[in-house]
């Protein structure tokens, strides 16, 4: 999750809107470097980044189990369910953590949808909306110090003539449009997508 720039004290490391943000993993990675005496990096997280939810990881595992030998070799990190929710418009953006009324309503609504699938397709335990809301409150506390409007920040950086390095992962053959479909990832891996994923 962490950009490679975290090891340089003159950089600002940005988690853009295009990232599938697993907040506990991000915090664990930050702790892993600061525990080794690396200075705390300056990190900004886009308020438009969407979060990998605990149930995304479960759904990923359940689907792999269901498919058995016909699975697509998922990393079981929740990526496919994450993007499914993002494009179905039931994902959670970081900004939504800071609107309590919206958050409560959405948690209940999304749990209703997910629990139908859990019961009838996977035959697994239901998600408790109260427990999920509490988890999101914990996420909010973790991420709050880093959240900002990254697009506005980068716009000012461009005007000031700052250097911006975009960082991605994987390669062309993992791109969902130009890769070896269906053995691909769930978001574009091409350089052209970098500006979109960063908010430039």
Which role fits each region the language model picked out?
Residues 1-200:
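Non-transmembrane, aqueous-exposed alpha-helical and coiled segments at domain scale
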């Amino acid at each position: 999750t962490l950009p490679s720039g975290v090891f340089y004290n003159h950089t600002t490391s940005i988690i853009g809107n295009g990232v599938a943000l697993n907040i506990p993993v991000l915090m664990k990675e930050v702790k892993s470097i600061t525990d080794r005496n690396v200075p705390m990096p300056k990190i900004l997280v886009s308020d438009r980044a969407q979060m990998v939810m605990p149930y995304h990881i479960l759904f990923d595992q359940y689907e792999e189990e269901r498919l058995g030998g016909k699975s697509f070799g998922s990393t079981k990190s929740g990526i496919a369910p994450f993007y499914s929710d993002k494009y179905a418009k039931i994902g959670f953006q970081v900004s939504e953590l800071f609107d309590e009324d919206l958050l409560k309503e959405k948690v209940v609504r999304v749990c209703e949808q997910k629990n139908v699938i859990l019961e009838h397709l996977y035959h697994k335990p239901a998600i408790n909306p109260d427990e999920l809301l509490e988890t999101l409150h914990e996420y909010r506390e973790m991420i709050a110090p880093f959240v900002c409007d990254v697009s506005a920040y980068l716009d000012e950086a461009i005007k000031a003539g700052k250097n911006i390095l975009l960082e991605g992962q994987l390669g062309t053959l993992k791109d969902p449009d130009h890769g070896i479909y269906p053995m691909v990832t769930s978001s574009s891996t091409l350089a052209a997508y970098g500006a979109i994923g960063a908010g430039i």
